[in-house]
Amino acid sequence: MNADAVQQYQHRTVLLDEAVDALALGGERANGVYVDGTFGRGGHSRKILQQLGSGARLLAFDKDTQAIANAATIDDQRFEIAHDSFATLSEALAVRGIKQVDGVLLDLGISSPQVDDATRGFSFRADGPLDMRMDTTRGMSAAEWLATETEQKIEKVIREYGEERFAFQIAKAIVARRAVEPISSTRQLAEIVARTVKTREKGKDPATRTFQAIRIFINQELEELEVVLNEAYRYLAPHGRLVVISFHSLEDRIVKQFMAGKANVPQPDRRLPIRAIDLPQPEMKLLSRVKPSAAEISENPRARSAVMRVAERLSPAARVVQ
């Protein structure tokens, strides 16, 4: 990708207006406490700050050191960023004495600048070190993991996190190749997969699923998502909004099931003598499922797989059936 194309992608936040609107920042809520769990390059945070009142507070998270450096350009006493995973939400709020929040926004996946920077190792389109860590200051790189992991575990990761039907063959090829030389670059891994996967999906590079799987595993993306969903719910004030943008089916499935589990509760047999006030009540209300418009996808093709789900925490009074 040339420099112009890289620049083109750097400042495009997917579903920017829709996500911030979903937080419902008007009225008294304008002076609430909000969380941007994935600062990235700050598109959502900056727009949220534009709509918040002087008494509001916005706490952002990001594991990427480049994102933290970018956040330093925001000179606003209402804003603070934590160099950590959003899975540490509970600890971060407790340290700051925050008892509840009025909205949580999560924009999952990786940002365009991360993909386009070959030194990060996220993309198979340009050669670079096989790293794939969101936070390059911590943890094991993809190259280090592939050098030591068992063939069975590599297969499991590629199959489960990449939904790759050739996971067995790819894992076998990786182990065979590492016996000859270290697999230390994105090009090496992409070539291994390309030689192994004989059936090609239309419009998709054969390495797509394998790179996704390893990235998800290295960064514990799905485990951290499950943690933050529960912590966000725990801290949401009545009528607080949970807004989540996901980019692949594994993420979206977790978000959908979590929200549905809070919104839909099993009802006991109606023939049982149970008072209405004692019946199980929903804890959240499902508000919307939004996809990017055709216009946004045309301007930013990377938005095409995005899905935004929005739910609102119900107040105790609202959860009682009258």
Curated annotation (Swiss-Prot):
First-tier enzyme category under EC: transferase
Annotated EC: 2.1.1.199
Keyword annotations: Cytoplasm, Methyltransferase, rRNA processing, S-adenosyl-L-methionine, Transferase
Reaction equation(s) it catalyzes: cytidine(1402) in 16S rRNA + S-adenosyl-L-methionine = N(4)-methylcytidine(1402) in 16S rRNA + S-adenosyl-L-homocysteine + H(+)
GO biological process: rRNA base methylation
Subcellular location: Cytoplasm
GO function terms (MF aspect): rRNA (cytosine-N4-)-methyltransferase activity
Record flagged with keyword Cytoplasm: yes
Chain sites annotated for binding S-adenosyl-L-methionine: 42-44, 62, 86, 107, 114
HAMAP family: 16SrRNA_methyltr_H
Primary role: Specifically methylates the N4 position of cytidine in position 1402 (C1402) of 16S rRNA.
Family: Belongs to the methyltransferase superfamily. RsmH family.
Protein name per Swiss-Prot or TrEMBL: Ribosomal RNA small subunit methyltransferase H
